Structures are given as structure tokens and as C-alpha cells.
Amino acid sequence: MADQQRVLITGGASGIGRAMAEAFVADGARVYVADVAGDPPDGCDLSILDVSDADAVDGLFDDVAATMGGLDVLCANVGIAGPVGPIEDLDVEGWDLTMAVNVRSAFLCCRRAVPMLREAGGGSILLTSSTAGVTGFPMRSPYAASKYAVIGLSDTLAMEVGEFGIRVNTLCPGSVDGDRMRRVIEAEAEVTGVPVADLRGAYEKQVSMRTFVEGRDIAAMAVFLASPAARYVNGQTIAVDGGLETLRNTWRT
């Protein structure tokens, strides 16, 4: 591993990924951000691409190798919320897009990252799933299914690469305050007819701490998991959700 951590973050120009990038930079890392659009946080390199495209991902990792000289940490974070509604109203295109962005991209990035991490003598892979990938999530079946798949990929990869000093863990954020959660609530309000304010209140009541998670909370956990302090943490699914244990009990109540 290099003296200065070399970190690649997909979906790093906004939301959770941007918070991760800022946190790693503050921790002294060299950070490369990949996203479909946007501007990089200060101190980061940036590539604009679709990380569900295999050729584009190959080009990304070639550039990461040329720019940073290797890789120590992959944060496979990119994701979309997917369509909202009862399953009978969802179309195949929405399902396929959600799986491509949320699952295919993680696979493509991991298969390129592992050889680079082995060459570096070890490292860390962090995949971003969701509490929806543990509990399920009514009205969001494509998203929940994709996030279950991310956990399966992460757990399996941890078994495969631990012997090479590569640790693989999964972050499961709860409802994250920001534009994406706002859009999800608005879409659900349109489908269900429930006012936006009531839905937001219901989401908050599902959490023991009665507030949404912030990107910086997930970013802090990412920096820890990539650090030597977490050198024996591997194959774990870690929720950063404020205690979101009541979702199953509030559906349709």
C-alpha cells in the first residue's frame, strides 16, 4: 500500500459519494472520482462516464492506474433510486436500468479493482448497499432487489480475496437527507396520494433517532473501514441508519 491512500469513488460528484470524497481528502488521501455528471470536490481527479458500461470502466481503471500509480481503496458507491410503485405498474426498462447502475457497475469495478489491490499488497473495497437490501422496501422492488444483490456480491468477494489482504465490506445507509430522498418521497406521494410532509414524517418515525442520516455519517464510516484501524474487519454489512428497525411494522399502518 502506498504511503498516501489512493482512493477511487464511483458516484463521487454528489450525495454520499461526494461526502466520501471530501472525507478521504480531509484524511490525506489521493482521491479519484467517477460519475455520470458533475464537478469533483476540491482536491479530487474526475472522470465522467457511465460505470455500467464495461468499456468505459476499463478506460476508467486504466486512467486511475496512470494518474495515481495504483489503487488502495475502491468505494463502489454509485446508485440510483429506481422506479417507485407497486410491482404490477413497473416496467422492464426501469428494472433493467436499476440493476445496471446499482449491480452491474459494482461487478465491473470490482473485477478491475481486485488485480490492482493485489498488486498493491492489499487494500479495501467498500460497496454501498442500503437498509432496503436487508429489510426490503415496499413500492421499491427494483431498488431493494439490487441492493440485496450488492450485499451478495460483497459477501462472496470477501471470501475470495481475503487471503490477498483485501478486505470487502458493505455500507447500508438508511434514508439519507438530500435531493434523492426528496425525489423518492415525491414519487411515492404521487403514486399513493399521501402528502409529501406526511410521508417524510413517516420515514423519520421509522428511525429510532427520528432523523434522516447525513452523507457525512456514511463518509466517516467509509474512512474508518478503509483505515488500518479496521484491518480485521472483513465481510461485514454495516448499517448507518440511526436504528431503522421499524419499517416492517409501519407498512400500511
Predicted regions and their residues:
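Short, small/polar-rich loop/turn modules that mediate ligand/substrate recognition or access, typified
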Residues: 162, 167, 233-235
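Active-site loop immediately N-terminal to the catalytic Tyr-X3-Lys motif
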Residues: 87-88, 135-142, 163-164, 210, ...
